[in-house]
C-alpha cells in the first residue's frame, strides 16, 4: 500500500505535513505496512508558502505506482491549475491510482483537470468561488471538513487535512487504527478561541 504526497513550491505547510504525520504514524504501527512517500515534479526541494523547505523522497517520474495520491493546497495550486503538464500528469495518475485525495485548494487542481465534474467536493472556505469558477458542475459542500466520494476524497482548508487523513486510516484499515493514530499524535481538537 503506497501513499504519495506531491509537494510543490508555495504548498501550504500543514496541508503537506498534517496528512504526512497522520499517515506516517499509521505506517509505523499498521500490519498493512503502508509506505508514505513525498515527491516533487523533478525530485528537487521545494519552498512552501510560509518558507519551510522540504526535500522530497523522489520525483514524480520515479515515484512508481501509488494506491493513494494526496495533493496538498496552498497558493502554489493557482499556477498548477493553468499548468498543462501538471494537469496531464494528474489525469494520468487518475487512470492508474485507485484513490485521489486533496487538501484545501488541492481540489482546485483536480477541478481544473476535469476530475471533479458532477461530483461532490470541498475546499478551503476562501476558495469556494474559485472551485465553482473552474467547474460549475462540482457539487460544492461548504460545510464538510472532508467529502468522501468513493475514489476521490477532498478536504476543506489546512487543518482539515488531518481529519481527512484520519478518515483514510479508518477507511483503509479500521476505525480502531485511526483512533490509535489520533491518540499517538494527541489530536483532540478543542480550539481555545
Each PLM stretch: what is its role?
Residues 148:
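Active-site rim beta-loop-alpha module in soluble metabolic enzymes
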Residues 115-133:
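Short, glycine-/small-residue-rich phosphate/pyrophosphate-handling segment
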Residues 7, 123, 156:
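Small/polar loops that bind or transfer phosphate-bearing groups
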Residues 1-100, 107-112, 129, 139-143, ...:
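Extended, subdomain-level signal for the structured scaffold at the beginning of enzyme domains
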Residues 100-101, 121:
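A short beta-strand/loop micro-motif in the catalytic core of glycosyltransferases
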Residues 151-157:
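A short glycine-threonine-serine/GTX helix/turn-capping micro-motif
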Residues 135-137:
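Active-site-proximal loop->helix
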Amino acid at each position: 500500500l503506497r501513499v504519495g504526497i506531491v509537494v510543490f513550491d508555495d504548498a501550504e505547510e500543514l496541508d503537506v505535513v498534517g496528512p504526512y504525520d497522520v499517515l506516517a504514524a499509521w505506517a509505523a504501527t499498521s500490519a498493512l505496512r503502508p509506505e508514505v512517500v513525498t515527491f516533487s515534479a523533478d525530485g528537487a526541494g521545494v519552498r512552501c508558502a510560509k518558507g519551510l523547505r522540504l526535500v522530497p523522497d523522489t520525483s514524480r517520474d520515479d515515484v512508481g505506482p501509488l494506491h493513494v495520491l494526496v495533493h496538498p493546497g496552498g497558493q502554489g495550486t493557482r499556477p498548477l491549475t493553468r499548468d498543462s503538464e501538471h494537469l496531464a500528469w494528474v489525469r494520468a495518475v487518475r487512470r492508474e491510482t485507485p484513490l485521489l485525495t486533496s487538501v484545501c485548494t488541492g481540489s482546485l487542481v483536480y477541478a481544473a483537470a476535469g476530475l471533479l465534474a458532477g461530483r461532490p467536493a470541498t475546499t478551503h472556505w476562501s476558495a469556494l468561488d474559485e472551485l465553482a469558477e473552474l467547474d460549475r458542475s462540482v457539487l460544492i459542500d461548504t460545510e464538510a471538513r472532508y467529502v468522501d466520494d468513493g475514489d476521490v476524497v477532498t478536504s476543506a482548508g489546512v487543518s482539515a487535512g488531518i481529519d481527512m487523513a484520519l478518515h483514510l486510516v479508518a477507511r483503509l484499515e479500521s476505525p480502531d487504527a485511526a483512533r490509535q493514530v489520533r491518540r499517538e499524535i494527541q489530536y483532540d481538537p478543542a480550539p481555545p478561541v
